[in-house]
């Protein structure tokens, strides 16, 4: 199941500012480099803003920033304080220990955050000047997330519980065994062997540090929050502190692996009883939030079981009558991070429309939706206190910074400029929005990035970027792996088509791809390549094609169908054999929905059409150099897919290399591995595309 926006950004955040005291590792390729072209080292040591919190009076912001050391191959994190007008920036922690997930507590008198104590993640609090640290939790095994009740009397936290271990439970005398006895599905998920489940706990704050809380799912093996990417944003405490709502898919094994049907549950703290608030709603229900007066609850809801990319709708529950209202009916865009206004009359949220993510306001009285912000950018998170809203913003040209938003005018004022000096060293990269006609008579938005000092009288090598997901928009994102800017910085024109099958262009466009993997979306890629080759500045013999995940599948497929359009390929974590992927991947609901069914369902026309488009069936047509990258801890698309593709290319006589990581998952997270990724990526492109 995909998780979006700031929770994921924080999960993989690795960097803090180079001007933070004591964090230079002496590497001359860090941000202090005077290079006029972005290097992998510059990209990977840029400051990365993680979680942030606006004070109750709206005047101050606390936020976390991290910076990896390439030499040490690990990251340090630090908390900073800044006024909401951008003044008074100062460090609150010294970076010697992890400091993440900051929140203002006690009406702004203190700041809570997570840090590592004796090898375990625990909650601490400090004064706003960074002094008087107090340990709030001392939970055995540590915690993973937290929320304070509005009255400050209760703490809700998340922590992992151990699941039964068949091998160890049956053989208690064998204390050094490593084998696993597996009896059902979901034994692996994302990048881990499933040995624990996240649970939600509640405890009184009267006695600190807290050493034990009440498990809301005591005796159950279910997840709350749900793996692999959900967090405490799927939990809400009522304003009166009498109950807790949480999202959970109360299934295990095979049943879990084929269903996306989660629900919102309400735990009554007085009676200890649990009620399903979304009984009969069959899709993915998440992100509960109570109105300021506690009379209503909103949540995000998908309609259909098994469809992880269904439209994310906003619903309202009247807690007195039980009536449910579909607030965003007719709005064909995903609702992210819905947040109540202080007066309870409006709900603010983020939505991606035509490949730009912006802030919106929904007025409850008439259900009218107003777009607040404008521009070629993505807003990826926000915090609201009263009428003050602070948001995290990024684009293909600049990483995340914090901005104060005027809710009436929609204007943005920068609060942070974490990478200002680095960006000032770089050339002027231009990002252009184009609309192209597709072969089925529709319009497709394509982003095009041009190198610095672009001269239309010259010829440039180019890269066609294939998106993953598959139902994931190429918006104005900033990435530390697939970064369009660094590609343009290295002299390439970068072509990024929002082909059929991505959200942000209406429901029909998004859903078209399911059961049509080798169809219209592939024709869209060829359209983008052909249209760009009409430009005189595109080198017709210097176009590469790259992509990860479903984008990697696209690369493998195009390698057998491109008819000499491309001069090299790069596939990261791609699907090579669809039949093998159906059985290897862990989230079977995705395979069932997108592929149409199982390969043994011979009378299932959709499934059989899908499997007939598997890239491994077209290796006989491969004739173009291909680089293959994969992580062996990738349990979404197993490394065997990359190994098969490499072996096939080598045996077929196609120039090929494989970059294989034994300790990376679907992403590449370790600093030195990330540098190796970028260096290998550009070495391959330069070898085949630059004359």
Curated annotation (Swiss-Prot):
One of its GO terms (cellular component) is periplasmic space. InterPro entries: 6-blade_b-propeller_TolB-like, AB_hydrolase_fold, Peptidase_S9_cat, Peptidase_S9B_N. It is found in: Periplasm. It is an enzyme of class 3 (hydrolase). Keywords: Aminopeptidase, Hydrolase, Periplasm, Protease, Serine protease, Signal. Its main location: periplasm. Residues 1-20 form the signal peptide. It comes from Porphyromonas endodontalis (strain ATCC 35406 / DSM 24491 / JCM 8526 / CCUG 16442 / BCRC 14492 / NCTC 13058 / HG 370) (Bacteroides endodontalis). This is Dipeptidyl-peptidase 5. Catalyzes the removal of dipeptides from the N-terminus of oligopeptides. Prefers Ala and hydrophobic residues at the P1 position, and has no preference for P2 residues. Shows the highest dipeptidyl peptidase activity toward the synthetic substrate Lys-Ala-methylcoumaryl-7-amide (Lys-Ala-MCA). Is likely involved in amino acid metabolism and bacterial growth/survival of asaccharolytic P.endodontalis, that utilizes amino acids from extracellular proteinaceous nutrients as energy and carbon sources. Belongs to the peptidase S9C family. Homodimer. Optimum pH is 6.7, using Lys-Ala-MCA as substrate. Its EC number is 3.4.14.-. One of its GO terms (biological process) is proteolysis. One of its GO terms (molecular function) is aminopeptidase activity. The active site is at residues 549, 634, 666.
């Amino acid at each position: 199941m995909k998780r979006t926006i700031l929770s994921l950004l924080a999960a993989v955040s690795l960097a803090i500012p180079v001007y933070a005291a004591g964090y230079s590792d002496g590497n001359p390729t860090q941000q202090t480099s005077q290079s006029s072209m972005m290097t992998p080292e510059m990209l990977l040591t840029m400051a990365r803003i993680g979680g942030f919190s606006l004070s109750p009076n709206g005047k101050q912001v606390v936020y976390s920033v991290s910076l990896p050391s390439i030499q040490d191959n690990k990251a340090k994190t630090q908390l900073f304080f800044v006024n909401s007008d951008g003044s008074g920036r100062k460090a609150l922690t010294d970076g010697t220990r992890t400091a993440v997930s900051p929140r203002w507590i006690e009406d702004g008198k203190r700041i809570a955050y997570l840090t590592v104590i004796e090898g375990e993640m625990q909650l601490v609090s400090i004064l706003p000047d960074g002094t008087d640290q107090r340990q709030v939790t001392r939970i055995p095994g540590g915690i993973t997330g937290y929320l304070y009740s509005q009255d400050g009397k209760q703490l809700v936290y998340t922590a992992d519980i151990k699941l039964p271990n068949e091998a160890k439970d049956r053989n208690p005398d064998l204390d050094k065994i490593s084998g696993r006895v597996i009896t059902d599905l979901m034994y692996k998920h994302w990048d881990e062997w499933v040995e624990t489940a996240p649970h939600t706990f509640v405890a009184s704050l009267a006695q600190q540090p807290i050493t034990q809380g009440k498990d809301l799912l005591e005796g159950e093996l279910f997840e709350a929050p749900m793996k692999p990417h959900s967090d405490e944003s799927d939990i809400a405490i009522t304003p009166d502190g009498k109950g807790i709502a949480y999202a959970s898919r109360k299934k295990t094994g095979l049943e879990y692996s084929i269903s996306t049907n989660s629900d919102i549950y309400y735990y009554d703290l007085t009676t200890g009883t649990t009620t399903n608030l979304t009984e009969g709603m069959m899709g993915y229900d998440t992100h509960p939030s109570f109105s300021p007066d506690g009379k209503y609850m909103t949540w995000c809801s998908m309609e259909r079981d098994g469809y992880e990319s269904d439209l994310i709708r906003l619903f309202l529950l009247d807690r007195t009558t039980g009536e449910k209202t579909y607030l965003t009916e007719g709005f064909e865009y995903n609702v992210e991070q819905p947040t109540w206004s202080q007066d309870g009359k409006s709900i603010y949220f983020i939505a991606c429309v035509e490949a730009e993510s912006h802030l919106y306001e929904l007025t409850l009285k008439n259900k009218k939706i107003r777009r607040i912000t404008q521009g070629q950018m993505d807003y990826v998170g926000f915090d609201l206190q009263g009428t003050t809203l602070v948001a995290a913003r990024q684009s293909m040209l600049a990483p995340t910074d914090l901005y104060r938003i005027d809710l009436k005018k929609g204007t943005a004022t920068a609060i942070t400029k974490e990478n200002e000096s680095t960006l000032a060293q770089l050339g002027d990269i231009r990002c252009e929005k184009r609309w192209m006609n597709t072969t089925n008579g529709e319009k497709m938005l394509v982003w095009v990035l041009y190198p610095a000092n672009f001269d239309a009288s010259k010829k440039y090598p180019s890269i066609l970027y294939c998106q993953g997901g598959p139902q994931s928009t190429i918006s104005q994102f900033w990435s530390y792996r697939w970064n369009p800017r660094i590609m343009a910085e290295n002299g390439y024109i970068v072509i990024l088509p929002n082909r059929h099958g991505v959200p942000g262009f209406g429901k029909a466009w998004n859903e078209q791809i399911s059961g049509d993997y080798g169809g219209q979306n592939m024709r869209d890629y060829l359209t983008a390549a052909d249209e760009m080759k009409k430009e005189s500045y595109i080198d017709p013999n210097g176009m590469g094609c790259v992509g990860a995940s479903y984008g990697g599948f696209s690369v493998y497929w195009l390698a057998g169908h491109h008819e000499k359009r491309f001069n090299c390929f790069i596939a990261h974590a791609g699907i090579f054999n669809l039949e093998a992927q159906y059985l290897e991947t862990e989230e079977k609901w995705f395979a069932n929905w997108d592929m149409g069914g199982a390969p043994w369902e011979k009378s299932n026309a959709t499934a059989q059409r899908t499997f007939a488009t598997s890239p491994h069936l077209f290796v006989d047509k491969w004739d173009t150099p291909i680089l293959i990258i994969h992580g062996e801890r990738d349990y979404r698309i197993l490394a065997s897919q990359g190994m098969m593709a490499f072996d096939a290319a080598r045996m077929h006589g196609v120039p090929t290399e494989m970059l294989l990581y034994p300790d990376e998952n679907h992403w590449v997270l370790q600093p030195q591995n990330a540098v190796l990724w970028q260096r290998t990526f550009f070495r391959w492109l330069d070898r085949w595309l630059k004359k």
